[in-house]
Amino acid sequence: MERKLALLLFLGMVTLASCGLREKHVQKLVALIPNDQLRSILKAVVHKVAKTQFGCPAYEGYCNNHCQDIERKDGECHGFKCKCAKD
Protein backbone atom coordinates (compact mmCIF):
# COMPACT_ATOMS: atom_id res chain seq x y z
CA MET A 1 0.00 0.00 0.00
CA GLU A 2 2.82 2.40 0.86
CA ARG A 3 4.48 1.78 -2.52
CA LYS A 4 1.25 2.50 -4.35
CA LEU A 5 0.81 5.75 -2.46
CA ALA A 6 4.41 6.76 -3.15
CA LEU A 7 4.01 5.96 -6.84
CA LEU A 8 0.78 7.94 -7.00
CA LEU A 9 2.42 10.93 -5.30
CA PHE A 10 5.41 10.68 -7.61
CA LEU A 11 3.29 10.58 -10.76
CA GLY A 12 1.19 13.46 -9.51
CA MET A 13 4.28 15.57 -8.86
CA VAL A 14 5.78 14.78 -12.26
CA THR A 15 2.48 15.72 -13.88
CA LEU A 16 2.34 19.01 -12.01
CA ALA A 17 5.96 19.77 -12.87
CA SER A 18 5.37 19.10 -16.56
CA CYS A 19 2.29 21.35 -16.61
CA GLY A 20 4.33 24.49 -16.13
CA LEU A 21 4.42 24.69 -12.37
CA ARG A 22 7.85 25.66 -11.16
CA GLU A 23 9.98 23.33 -9.09
CA LYS A 24 9.53 25.43 -5.95
CA HIS A 25 5.76 24.81 -6.07
CA VAL A 26 6.16 21.05 -6.42
CA GLN A 27 8.82 20.92 -3.70
CA LYS A 28 6.25 22.41 -1.31
CA LEU A 29 4.11 19.33 -1.98
CA VAL A 30 7.11 17.07 -1.35
CA ALA A 31 7.51 18.74 2.05
CA LEU A 32 4.18 17.20 3.07
CA ILE A 33 5.69 13.70 2.84
CA PRO A 34 7.23 12.41 6.09
CA ASN A 35 10.98 12.95 6.31
CA ASP A 36 12.64 9.71 5.20
CA GLN A 37 14.47 8.14 2.27
CA LEU A 38 11.39 8.29 0.02
CA ARG A 39 11.15 12.04 0.50
CA SER A 40 14.81 12.48 -0.45
CA ILE A 41 14.33 10.40 -3.59
CA LEU A 42 11.20 12.32 -4.62
CA LYS A 43 12.96 15.66 -4.10
CA ALA A 44 15.83 14.54 -6.34
CA VAL A 45 13.49 13.23 -9.05
CA VAL A 46 11.37 16.39 -9.07
CA HIS A 47 14.54 18.48 -9.34
CA LYS A 48 15.81 16.43 -12.31
CA VAL A 49 12.44 16.55 -14.10
CA ALA A 50 12.19 20.30 -13.56
CA LYS A 51 15.68 20.84 -14.99
CA THR A 52 14.96 19.03 -18.27
CA GLN A 53 12.10 21.35 -19.26
CA PHE A 54 10.23 18.84 -21.44
CA GLY A 55 7.97 21.60 -22.76
CA CYS A 56 10.87 23.29 -24.51
CA PRO A 57 10.79 21.42 -27.86
CA ALA A 58 7.07 20.63 -27.68
CA TYR A 59 5.45 24.02 -27.12
CA GLU A 60 6.18 27.13 -29.16
CA GLY A 61 6.98 30.04 -26.88
CA TYR A 62 7.57 27.86 -23.79
CA CYS A 63 11.11 29.13 -23.23
CA ASN A 64 10.17 32.73 -23.80
CA ASN A 65 7.43 32.42 -21.16
CA HIS A 66 9.79 30.54 -18.83
CA CYS A 67 12.55 33.15 -19.07
CA GLN A 68 10.11 36.05 -18.76
CA ASP A 69 8.72 34.44 -15.61
CA ILE A 70 12.03 33.86 -13.84
CA GLU A 71 14.41 36.50 -15.24
CA ARG A 72 12.34 38.99 -17.26
CA LYS A 73 14.42 38.16 -20.37
CA ASP A 74 13.74 36.60 -23.75
CA GLY A 75 14.43 32.88 -24.08
CA GLU A 76 14.93 30.21 -26.71
CA CYS A 77 14.96 26.42 -26.72
CA HIS A 78 18.38 24.76 -26.84
CA GLY A 79 17.98 20.98 -26.89
CA PHE A 80 15.79 20.17 -23.90
CA LYS A 81 16.65 23.27 -21.90
CA CYS A 82 15.73 26.92 -22.17
CA LYS A 83 18.46 29.49 -22.61
CA CYS A 84 17.65 32.96 -21.36
CA ALA A 85 19.21 35.98 -23.05
CA LYS A 86 22.31 37.43 -21.45
CA ASP A 87 22.61 41.10 -20.51
Swiss-Prot record:
<protein>
    <recommendedName>
        <fullName>Scorpine-like peptide Tco 41.46-2</fullName>
    </recommendedName>
</protein>
<feature type="disulfide bond">
    <location>
        <begin position="63"/>
        <end position="82"/>
    </location>
</feature>
<feature type="domain" description="BetaSPN-type CS-alpha/beta">
    <location>
        <begin position="53"/>
        <end position="87"/>
    </location>
</feature>
<keyword id="KW-0872">Ion channel impairing toxin</keyword>
<keyword id="KW-0528">Neurotoxin</keyword>
<comment type="similarity">
    <text>Belongs to the long chain scorpion toxin family. Class 1 subfamily.</text>
</comment>
<dbReference type="InterPro" id="IPR029237">
    <property type="entry name" value="Long_scorpion_toxin_alpha/beta"/>
</dbReference>
<keyword id="KW-0732">Signal</keyword>
<dbReference type="GO" id="GO:0090729">
    <property type="term" value="F:toxin activity"/>
</dbReference>
<feature type="disulfide bond">
    <location>
        <begin position="67"/>
        <end position="84"/>
    </location>
</feature>
<keyword id="KW-0964">Secreted</keyword>
<keyword id="KW-0800">Toxin</keyword>
<dbReference type="GO" id="GO:0015459">
    <property type="term" value="F:potassium channel regulator activity"/>
</dbReference>
<keyword id="KW-0632">Potassium channel impairing toxin</keyword>
<dbReference type="GO" id="GO:0042742">
    <property type="term" value="P:defense response to bacterium"/>
</dbReference>
<keyword id="KW-1015">Disulfide bond</keyword>
<feature type="disulfide bond">
    <location>
        <begin position="56"/>
        <end position="77"/>
    </location>
</feature>
<dbReference type="GO" id="GO:0005576">
    <property type="term" value="C:extracellular region"/>
</dbReference>
<keyword id="KW-0044">Antibiotic</keyword>
<keyword id="KW-0929">Antimicrobial</keyword>
<feature type="signal peptide">
    <location>
        <begin position="1"/>
        <end position="19"/>
    </location>
</feature>
<dbReference type="Pfam" id="PF14866">
    <property type="entry name" value="Scorpion_toxin_alpha-beta"/>
</dbReference>
